[in-house]
Amino acid sequence: VGTDDAAAREEADRLAGLFWEKRREFQVRLYTVGEIVKLADERRAGDPPFVISDSADSPGAGATGDSNVVLKELLAHGAHRRHRCLLTIVDAPAAARAAEAGVGSEVTLRVGYTLNRNARYGAPMEITGSVRHVGEGVFRIGGGYAENTVAKMGRCAVVDIGKLSLLVTERPTFSGDPAMYRCVGLEPAEADVVLVKSANQFRAEYEKLTDRIFILDTPGISPANLAGLRFDKIRRPFYPFDDNLEWRIDS
């Protein structure tokens, strides 16, 4: 902020030009679940886990945490047969049914989209697995802006589908801390693929475990890919929705 109008405008123009010149450097590399499975197939024993972020379904960003997109894709690619995967989903009815069945029981559940019922994002799916754990999910967040906050998932259950463990919770909560899985007997450090539903805050604790972090290109309320959002009142052309436009400071 300056008192000289001409100098202030000149500096604003300089910054605008700099941002435009470097606009592509702000873009994050996004991965499909299929790409993650291929990379996991090449992973060597003893390598640190892959942490995959489904930021489109982040409760911290206003999403509901009940998307089954990543689960569906991992199963479709057969990852549950080859890789130790840890996933989470919010689904109170499914958590209750698994808890009622009890540890060791085989259950068939419909999971996903009990809170977000907009069909454009997805639909419930049926799974069959073995109940590994039931209980009340409570953990303390280790680091970042919510350090030492107690998170409560409500009634929860872990259902195993092959080598994949799905943590089904009653309530949405922050899922970007390894303590979420650890409080139900799952260890992220020993997994091949770990799902978090967090855009960035998860790095505070997960970067202590691994540098293999991947942001997914998934549909949802808070996607990493802005093109996945619908804007009805937007001037076109507009970056990044249009990438072939020319822009000048005086335009």
Predicted regions and their residues:
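Hard-cation-handling environments
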Residues: V1-R171
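Extended hydrophobic packing segments that form well-structured cores
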Residues: W20, V138-S251
